[in-house]
Amino acid sequence: MSNSQSEGKRQPAIVILDFGSQYSELIARRVRETEVYSLVMSYCTSADELRQLAPKGIILSGGPSSVYAERAPLCDPNIWDLGIPVLGVCYGMQLMVQQLGGRVEAAIGKAEYGKAPLQVEDPRDLLTNVESGSTMWMSHGDVVRDLPEGFVRLAHTANTPDAAVADHNRQFYGVQFHPEVVHSSHGIALIRNFVYHICGCEPNWTTTAFIEEAIAQVQAQVGQKRVLLALSGGVDSSTLAFLLKKAIGDQLTCMFIDQGFMRKGEPEFLMDFFDQKFHINVEYINARQRFISKLKGIIDPEEKRKIIGTEFIRVFEEESNRLGPFDYLAQGTLYPDVIESSGTNIDPKTGERVAVKIKSHHNVGGLPKDLQFKLVEPLRRLFKDEVRKVGRALGLPEEIVRRHPFPGPGLAIRILDEVNDEKLNCLRDADLIVREEIREAGLYHEIWQAFAVLLPVRSVGVMGDKRTYAWPIVLRCVSSEDGMTADWSRLPHELLERISNRIVNEVRGVNRVVLDITSKPPGTIEWE
């Protein structure tokens, strides 16, 4: 999302220039938490483009490069003449120093990673209410050796003399740590200082404001034409259904494609919920065998995602011809979906991505090139927590608002092998046990996602004095705020024991349960 058209008509108060950091969008989320709208754009964005956007502040993100490297990503040097306050974070600070006449070098023997106490020397402006000795998250192998003219030191750590710097006259600020991550204890205070006290922003990015703008944007985009919604029953598509119903009424047709990869009992729950409780008409399409046959012999996860995405569109196209005509396809694509599917930062000199592509999202990377619909994606500028707020404001019940995220390709990407009915039934039963036990323990709403994964191997076991040779199930439970980063959930041992015992005793074809204790990064939440 690097252009104002895809973001609607609202102009960003804060622009984040992305230099390839996996935390760039987290910066945007932290700014939005202050009720100020922010937009992530490529580091290639020109000073002229920024002048037209007229943001009140600019944040330069971190990144994996060194500013002195031959192909280091650089921002337009004319940005420094715009008269707009700038905050550089990690690489962004080093770039600011380098371009304004300072010097950055490799931190030989003194690279700093992880938590470090910040010693505040100047508590004005940026560091107001940031306590000296507070913990900040460091992640850098380079350090500033010489500050540019006009800059002063604001704070230091044990290994970083210039951990925070400023040119107060020009309102240029830099920090060598990451205030956006949860590990930085006073990071939010620092961001608020920059957004409110330095940039003078107003708190007008609210749920009510978004709903009003989104409705107006959809009405302007769609006009009197009809929209087909790909409804899955999760919080994203359900919120989208409520939003579109409010915006365009009977111009909306919801369609649920049962591709055979849903969790146990979900198709029935979905149809009852929308039809009986909220009287939103949903067309049910049973396409289970069609999807499973398309995945025959397919193991590669990227190929699975693209096949499922393509087949979804094909089914929608066929059904739209029967029910239509429809001009638009609505999707519950969110900001993290777009982020994980493509790096927006392409070096114009080398053609190389600065940010590494993680995996294609089924709503983004899986779309066929000959798509017959125009897309309506009013949620694509929101993070998951923002979607939940919108859903609540629109009247969506908590049982939907607080449901755990579920991938569009469903259980097909939780079977790390060829997909067939036997494996699907096995995984459905195991997954149901996981969710039942976590709900019974009162932990469901404390966990971001909890699910089972079926591995493509078999292990030896003994049951009833007989040798077994069956599949292992992986238990994956993570805690997160927005899905951008995640930590594995520390479940009570007694709960883990109950889950394991039930799965090996109740699920046919399984004789072993293992626990995934990998955080994101380095892993992703889903296995495929």
Curated annotation (Swiss-Prot):
Q: Where does ATP bind?
A: S232, G233, G234, V235, D236, S237, S238
Q: Does the keyword ATP-binding apply?
A: yes
Molecular function (GO) terms for this protein are:
ATP binding; GMP synthase activity
List each copy of the Glutamine amidotransferase type-1 domain by range.
13-204
Enzyme Commission no: 6.3.5.2
Domain of life of the native organism: Bacteria
List residues of the GMPS ATP-PPase domain. Answer: 205-403
What job does this protein perform?
A: Catalyzes the synthesis of GMP from XMP.
- Name of the protein this chain belongs to: GMP synthase [glutamine-hydrolyzing]
Kindly list the organism's lineage: Bacteria, Bacillati, Cyanobacteriota, Cyanophyceae, Synechococcales
Q: Which gene encodes it?
A: guaA
